[in-house]
Amino acid sequence: MTWAGKTLQEFQAALASDDPTPGGGSAAGVALGQAAALAVMVSDLTLSKESLKEGWSISERVKEVALPLLDLGLELATQDSQSFDAVVESF
């Protein structure tokens, strides 16, 4: 199961279900991606305003760090579910 192609509603429904996955680790991965997306948004807003030029340097760095976390968060969410599914199957 990969969570990257699911809608928010599908992920939330799966999280609320009685299945063992997704669980907290997968939710944390998705939250990481969402936090990174917000960091990119604020960086882009800052970079688009001449009046905030003094913050451009740090905004560029924040965006550089946050962009890879968009995909990493989803990858970690999927890895967590797959790992725990393997544990459940072993019992």
What are these regions (language model features)?
Residues 3-21:
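Short, hydrophobic/aliphatic alpha-helical segments
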Residues 50-91:
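A structural-propensity feature for long, helix-poor, extended segments
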